[in-house]
A protein has these predicted regions:
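Membrane-water interface regions at transmembrane-helix termini and the short interhelical loops
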Residues: 1-6, 120, 124-132
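Start-transfer (signal-anchor) and selected internal transmembrane alpha helices
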Residues: 1-37, 48, 139, 202
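Structural motif corresponding to the C-terminal cap of alpha-helices
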Residues: 64-65, 97-101, 133, 151, ...
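Membrane-interface coil-to-helix junctions
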Residues: 23-121, 162-165, 169
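Membrane-interface starts of transmembrane alpha-helices
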Residues: 8-15, 102-113, 134-141
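Glycine-rich, flexible loop segments associated with nucleotide phosphate handling
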Residues: 14-17, 45-47, 105-109, 193-208
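Membrane-embedded helix bundles of polyisoprenyl
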Residues: 23-30, 113-128, 137-218
Length: 219
């Protein structure tokens, strides 16, 4: 069999990209398995945290803003909300697709969030593996994160409506940006006397900082 086409970067990158996409779809499909038991029931599987996250989304959709103080807890004083708003805003975006169809439809919509964010870990892990090794390492890393069990899998299931998956995704995205920065700057001379040598450090520094900030905004 002639594999000469593999020497063509266009075809090689297309095939590898297609495999990454396929693994991502498989990761999402696995995480959507609980849908059959949850859709239309108005139920979720993450305990009380899921219901409080739902409250934050409902308040955001109703008022247009994230509440920084919760008057309904620590009675009679209330208390500050100490974690970031990013997961709530992402979930509210999904919730908008439910329209004005009621609370059950909203729950069905936001229940997609952990599954989608969990599946997005596949391309992130692929690029980390590819940069640290090669494309085969990247595919193995993506496949591993798609099917690995334990806490990561359970917290990325449809209906496990909690913010931990967002913490994992954005902190791993920070690692990717950091690794890319180190790899691209390896062996390059950086000097304050040569402004052009500062371009790449600034670009990767900013990207890493943004990814780090996004992870903090989910914690």
């Amino acid at each position: 069999m002639d594999f000469s086409f593999w020497n063509n970067k266009k075809y090689r990158y297309g095939i590898i990209g297609g495999v990454v996409l396929l693994i991502t779809v498989i990761a999402l499909a696995i995480r959507l398995l609980p849908m059959g038991d949850l859709v239309g029931t108005g139920d979720m599987i993450a305990g009380p945290d899921a219901w409080y996250n739902l409250r934050l989304v409902e308040v955001l959709l109703a008022s247009g803003g994230f509440i920084s103080f919760e008057a309904m807890t620590l009675f009679p004083y209330g208390q500050d909300i100490v974690w970031g708003p990013l997961f709530t805003y992402i979930s509210a975006f999904f919730g908008m697709f439910a329209g004005d169809a009621g609370r059950t439809a909203l729950i069905d919509a936001v229940s997609w969030v952990p599954a989608v964010l969990g599946a997005l870990m596949v391309p992130v892990m692929f690029f980390i593996g590819k940069k640290l090794g090669d494309w085969k390492t990247g595919l193995l890393a993506g496949l591993f994160i798609a099917v690995v069990g334990g806490q990561f899998f359970s917290r990325t299931l449809y209906g496990h409506f909690d913010h931990h998956v967002a913490e994992t995704l954005f902190s791993t995205l920070f690692v990717l940006c950091y690794v890319l920065g180190l790899a691209n700057l390896n062996g390059k001379e950086i000097s304050l006397k040569n402004p052009s040598s500062l371009k790449l450090p600034l670009i990767f520094g900013v990207l890493s900082g943004i990814a780090y900030l996004l992870s903090l905004l989910t914690m």
